[in-house]
């Protein structure tokens, strides 16, 4: 059970869904200095990544998560949400084909992607001379390994490129998305993307079909830093979506995106989704006591339930297992 309240923290026994057997990764917001928060986290056996603007990511032993949550220096803690791949747009539907004859082809612009990776050997992502258009690949699946343009060019000259740059795109989703946006180079022009002469940067998420919101935040920070280093205007594409959260901009991921968009030279593009009629959410007014029944399959080890309310009303929630034995009682 996960109860979201703006007062402090959003944690529950379901944090195992975003962890391994010993550690959990969470996003936080704090009004203290990065050095102070880093020291607090290190004292609890964890690692802190500063994202700027008070945001950060903490990797911490599971048994110390409650201690982190009770620190007066931490304003809010949030478990990462899962975001899934989306790519249902086309150039024709977006009226891009009508401007292909113009000179607006993305020259001098860095387009960053947070996705499943990229097939860097594909001719659509090379210049006319065969060199790569990819400035960086940031592979979170390899523990955050960064491959540079020089390394990618070296790999392209090799008979065994993956021995030099081993990052791949297993599902092909990221490659497909980059193709829609940036395909160009040595392919038929009818398959060109929106910005066929732009530079490319890829953040590969550490899951094959979905990403955690903490990975998205790491990726945004990386791409913004690289855009500054290259002194190039930056657009970030995330063809990922989720039905987790309140859908009102209150999650730390949403707040971080809003803050970055308002303060940095960046345009952030996200997938709109195609699930408006899927009925993933339900709303209503609680009158006295409401009982809701649901089934959990025997092969489901973890179930996450998100409930949202306005700030003032008090709500008490009790979760009962078969036999009417109280499992947990929460008040928000």
Show which residues each predicted segment covers.
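Autoinhibitory N-terminal propeptides
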Residues: 4-56, 63-102, 110, 123, ...
